């Protein structure tokens, strides 16, 4: 064979090898070209015009809460008690009307002795003729009618007991109003937290929906690769298991949405047919808090603003006023009394006649009982002990508020810190998933690596959503913990 022919044969062989290699490279491309088209990954929905916001939910919960209605009725009861005690400052006016039918009693005879008919008034002269007279007959009247109007004014009771009972009732009414106001603010805060819990569940559902779509795309990719003998059957089964798990998480997320929506409907007390949509853009992060004052200053602010603290102060003051009023019987009771009566017959007329007679009387009455003194001192000690118990509760409440404020501040700081880190993590996870899928389609990445990228992307999406919701939840709690929502509230 000539050298020229030998060189031509080698060239032909190289051309055939190149053609065969190009054909091998084209087959996967043709296979990938037949990959089924999927629906795009769903985007998270934004706010809906006319949808619910946290403030709207709080307002509706406030106006429909049965717990708040109960507290307001307690306020009415306390106000009525103040009116009842106020009457004690005025003199006591009392009217009595009585009628009595008496049994028959034989008339009484009153002997009148002897008389000297015609004799002048004065000493009788000797020899004056005396005549024995008939005895006077006194009839017993069987009908007894009496109309009496009495007026009394307990001087010492008004000074020592009624005035302090009125102060105690006024403080109790103030405590009831403060309790109702505190309940109102707590209901509003809890309603906001319920709303954000529902929003969080909806975001979790959307993330789960996107995870299912990604798992379906991964399964189709790995099936195509399996047909091209680029992956093993075990890789296909692994992705099928991943898809099944994603579908399970989606079902749980949907159930969580249904549960939190039922909670929200209970809070709103609305119609079951009402369609609930989110009217607040929770995809936007809130501005970061630049910094906080010292925790001691925040705890003092909470103690000054929170209505629960003011309510306990009013309750303790009411108990001490009750203790002072309970000790009033230690001092003798002095009462001014007066009365007027119209009686038939009158006990002040002798002899009794069948006619009405008007009379009056006025005086001062003093009374004192050692038994009442012992009871009053014991009652006073009881109220003082209750007042000291209220003082201890107040100290415990302030300690709890300090812890609550510290926790709320930490939650705000953690949520703000998570905003930046989760945003960076989500961007990295999205880009990592995109690149990893392209590498897998090109045969330069394994199915396990793509699965890890999908898992990381789902986790990053969930973390980013949680961070934005946590911002709103933590601020609502901090606002309530510091008592800054008291300014915008209207006490009953």
Give the predicted meaning of each segment.
Residues 39-50, 96-151, 281-292, 324, ...:
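Small/polar, glycine/serine/threonine/aspartate-rich low-complexity segments that form flexible
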Residues 3, 180-301, 411, 415, ...:
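Periplasmic alpha-helical coiled-coil/stalk elements that build and connect Gram-negative outer-membrane
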Residues 32-35, 101-103, 461-492:
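Acidic, low-complexity, intrinsically disordered peripheral segments
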Residues 17-29:
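Bacterial N-terminal signal peptides
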Residues 33-98, 104-106, 155-156, 161, ...:
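Bacterial Sec-pathway N-terminal export signals of envelope proteins
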Residues 59-69, 76-92, 135-141, 150-167, ...:
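A glycine-/polar-enriched beta->alpha junction
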Residues 70-85, 183, 187-206, 217-219, ...:
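Amphipathic alpha-helical coiled-coil segments
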């Amino acid at each position: 064979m000539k050298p020229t022919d030998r060189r031509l044969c080698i060239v032909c062989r190289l051309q055939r090898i190149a053609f065969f290699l190009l054909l091998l490279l084209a087959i996967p491309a043709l296979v990938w070209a037949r990959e089924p088209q999927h629906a795009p990954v769903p985007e998270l929905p934004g706010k809906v015009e006319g949808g619910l916001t946290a403030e709207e939910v709080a307002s509706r919960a406030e106006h429909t809460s049965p717990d708040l209605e109960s507290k307001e009725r307690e306020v009415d009861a306390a106000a009525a008690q103040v009116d009842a005690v106020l009457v004690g400052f005025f003199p006591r006016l009392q009217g009595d009307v009585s009628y009595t039918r008496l049994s028959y009693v034989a008339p009484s005879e009153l002997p009148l002795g002897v008389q000297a008919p015609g004799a002048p008034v004065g000493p009788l002269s000797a020899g004056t003729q005396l005549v024995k007279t008939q005895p006077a007959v006194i009839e017993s009247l069987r009908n007894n009618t009496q109309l009496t109007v009495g007026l009394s004014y307990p001087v010492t009771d008004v000074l020592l007991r009624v005035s302090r009972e009125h102060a105690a009732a006024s403080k109790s009414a103030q405590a009831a109003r403060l309790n109702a106001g505190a309940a109102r603010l707590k209901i509003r805060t809890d309603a906001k937290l319920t709303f954000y819990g529902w929003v969080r569940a909806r975001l979790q559902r959307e993330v789960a929906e996107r995870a299912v779509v990604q798992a379906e795309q991964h399964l189709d990719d790995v099936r195509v690769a399996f047909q091209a003998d680029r992956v093993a059957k075990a890789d296909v089964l692994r992705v099928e298991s991943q898809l099944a798990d994603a579908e399970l998480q989606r079902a749980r997320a949907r159930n969580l949405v249904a549960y939190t929506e039922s909670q929200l409907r209970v809070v709103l007390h609305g119609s079951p047919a009402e369609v609930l949509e989110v009217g607040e853009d929770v995809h936007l992060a809130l501005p970061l808090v630049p910094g906080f004052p010292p925790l001691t200053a925040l705890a003092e602010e909470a103690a000054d603003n929170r209505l629960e603290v003011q309510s306990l102060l009013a309750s303790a003051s009411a108990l001490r006023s009750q203790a002072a009023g309970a000790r009033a019987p230690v001092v003798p009771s002095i009462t001014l009394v007066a009365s007027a009566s119209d009686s038939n017959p009158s006990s002040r007329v002798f002899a009794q006649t069948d006619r009405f007679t008007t009379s009056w009387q006025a005086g001062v009455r003093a009374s004192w009982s050692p038994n009442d003194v012992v009871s009053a001192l014991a009652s006073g000690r009881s109220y003082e002990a209750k007042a000291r118990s209220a003082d201890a509760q107040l100290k415990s409440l302030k300690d709890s508020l300090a812890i609550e404020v510290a926790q709320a501040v930490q939650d705000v700081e953690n949520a703000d810190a998570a905003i930046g880190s989760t945003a960076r993590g989500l961007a990295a996870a999205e880009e990592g998933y995109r690149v990893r899928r392209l590498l897998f389609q090109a045969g330069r990445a394994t199915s396990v690596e793509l699965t890890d990228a999908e898992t990381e992307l789902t986790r990053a999406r969930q973390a980013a959503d949680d961070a934005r919701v946590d911002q709103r939840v933590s601020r609502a709690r901090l606002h309530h913990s510091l008592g800054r929502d008291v300014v915008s509230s209207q006490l009953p």
